[in-house]
């Protein structure tokens, strides 16, 4: 569980750093968590995606999968586009 907590903290930090801060209608991108754990008969569902930036150009799309089989594995893919000029992609994988 502490691996998932650490991963969520990293995701939130990236959201703050790459949130939309330009334009008169600037707003932080929002993220949602959730999804279900998969099993051999039912696949895991995905967590929510980040919200769009206030000016319509910046957005952060956060995608995290958590699967429990023999080990705990957390997969997160973060993609940020800031003002159509900066493209940032980060991947993290933690296994217990």
From Swiss-Prot:
Location of the protein in the cell: Secreted
Give start-end positions of Low complexity composition bias. Answer: 27-46
Would you list which residues are glycosylated? 20
Location of region: Disordered: 27-58
Cleaved signal peptide residues: 1-19
Alphabetized UniProt keyword annotations: Glycoprotein, Secreted, Signal
* GO cellular component entries: extracellular region
Q: Which domain of life is it from?
A: Eukaryota
Biased composition, Gly residues: where in the chain? 47-56
What is the protein named? Answer: Uncharacterized protein DDB_G0282307
Lineage of producing organism:
Eukaryota, Amoebozoa, Evosea, Eumycetozoa, Dictyostelia
């Amino acid at each position: 569980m502490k691996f998932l907590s650490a991963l969520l903290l990293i995701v939130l930090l990236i959201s703050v750093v790459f949130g939309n801060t330009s334009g008169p209608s600037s707003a932080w991108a929002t993220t949602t968590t959730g999804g279900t754990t998969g099993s051999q008969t039912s696949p895991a569902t995905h967590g929510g995606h980040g919200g769009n930036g206030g000016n319509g150009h910046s957005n952060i799309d956060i995608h995290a999968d958590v699967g429990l089989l023999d080990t705990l594995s957390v997969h997160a893919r973060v993609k940020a586009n800031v003002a159509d000029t900066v493209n940032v992609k980060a991947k993290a994988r933690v296994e217990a």
